[in-house]
Amino acid sequence: MKKISYLLLMLLSYLSCAEPPTQFDEAALNDTFITLEGSKVTLQSILEKHKGKTIVIDIWASWCGDCIRGMPKVKALQKEYTDVVYLFFSLDKGIEAWKRGIKRYNVEGEHYYLPKAKKSAFGDFVNISWIPRYMVINKASEIVVFNVIEADDNKLIKALKN
């Protein structure tokens, strides 16, 4: 019994240290987002549009207090790292709330609405447990920051400097 408990503990330790993914899976890449104009686009087409550039993905919602409090930090990043593409993926409860939130909080960047939010293929892939959530995709199209919840997190800043 002791050996089984020990092996189980070792397995759990190993799994908790697993490396985050460096590429989106096929289901996430094929997930559908909605543009401000109302068009449907896939994550793959969004990323291909910015191939060769560093991308910050901000997963947020207008109802999220932490997201709104974090906006000044995002705006500071945008001011300092002007060559970076900023994508905002909204988990708002509806398109109108999403659009109002963008205007109300003067969020600058490219905006996309995720209709199925956490229940989408993208939501499953990134395992959204908290927002805001920030990710960084490098110029080689690799996910180099998978999960930070503060826009001034050292991991995020380091990735933008590279």
Where are these regions (language model features)?
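Bacterial Sec-dependent N-terminal signal peptides
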Residues: M1-D25
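N-terminal "domain-start" segment that seeds a small globular fold
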Residues: C17-K49, G109-E110
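Short loop/turn microsegments at loop-to-beta-strand junctions
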Residues: A28-L29, I55, I131-P132
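Short active-site neighborhood of thiol/selenol oxidoreductases, capturing the structured segment around
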Residues: I46-C64
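Conserved hydrophobic packing residues within short motifs/helices of P-loop NTPase cores
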Residues: I57, L87-F89, M135
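Conserved redox-active cysteine motifs that mediate thiol-disulfide chemistry
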Residues: I59-A76
